[in-house]
């Protein structure tokens, strides 16, 4: 393999020397990966994951961990996705709109999305009903064991009440189906096979991003009936159904996961996928660096000291291979107390007066030099950490 290094936080190597990334929603079976350098395109991609971050659940409706989502979102698509700026983008929903006060949202679904099994064979067509089944599963305390309920119960009319009902019913709630959810007044509807509507408790101009969350992913009633509730809850790569860009070719727990393109992926003409993508479990970064140097990994993260070693030597072979790693999907915020009291319960007049002043509050931002902190995440271009975000409406 030719070399390449991920930089601000890692190394990136590529067969033939091209740079690529593992973006999850990546083109038709056998299509070549994106290539911006003019070098030989990278067809097979070998990435890594820490050994202590092995997947625990293959069921996105049940799982609440980023570790699981990093795997299964390559295999299972939802209503919405996001572009490289974090803005909501189409997935199974091709378009959407809302009413004037953003309480009623309507999603129009593609009519060419299929469920496939682990062998890539089509099992069933996806319609709006699959999203009804998925939401009922999430809101049913007996089926999903109270996981992933926060988003729908916070935003959707009647969702919290239905969840509480299933909790009170105990094991008997396992016999409920999506029609019972609709009859209970939960704010979701499917007027036809390719239209899905949600009614929110309050105006929610950003609900398109909420609808991207795994709580709103589809599920097949046929698969649930085939496996049974407990087995579907604990499904794995061999018995789950797929609707995302990849299917799992091989999974060796604690060792590797190999993905190949889903031969029936609905968006194959518009995206690029690797012919094979392998994730190797790594116990420590020293081993990762050795594998990278032996061209057994296509990318790896670098710690700050290693980046400093590379960048301080203009002749270091890895300087030309450094590239910035995408920022973590998290943010930090300050919440001010505008009515602070003293220990004796009386108002803290000085603080309350100061914090009410806009210029004083801005000092917390303007007066902080965060460059050193940002360098921990992006040593090459630390101030870019300030700008890698998308501010949505509302």
Where are these regions (language model features)?
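Gly/Pro-rich hinge or "lid" segments in bacterial periplasmic/extracellular proteins
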Residues: 168-185, 189-195, 199-272, 276
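C-terminal motif of bacterial Sec signal peptides marking the signal peptidase cleavage site
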Residues: 11-14
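N-terminal export leaders
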Residues: 1-3
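N-terminal low-complexity, Pro/Thr/Ser-rich intrinsically disordered segments
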Residues: 26-46
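Bacterial signal peptide processing site
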Residues: 16-19
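N-terminal lobe/hinge region of extracytoplasmic solute-binding protein
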Residues: 48-101, 241
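Structural transition elements
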Residues: 384-394
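Extracytoplasmic/periplasmic ligand-capture domains
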Residues: 84, 110-144, 245-377, 394
